[in-house]
Amino acid sequence: MPHKRLPDWMNDVKLVMTKDNISVEELASRLNLTSNYIVSVINGYRRSICTRINISKALGLNPGDYIM
């Protein structure tokens, strides 16, 4: 099974956040990061693997499904 690429990860993150009613500010607070930084990672402007893994874990997604 091929790994999902960044657009799949971005969509899945946004879907989980919407479904679970998690705001960017709440996610940023959980990860001790700024909301601007979180948005830039989610939208693909920053490719921080570590942050993507932490966002995935915080939202209950399997980070291994999104390895590029």
Identify what each model region corresponds to.
Residues 33-47:
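Recognition helix of helix-turn-helix/homeodomain-like DNA-binding domains
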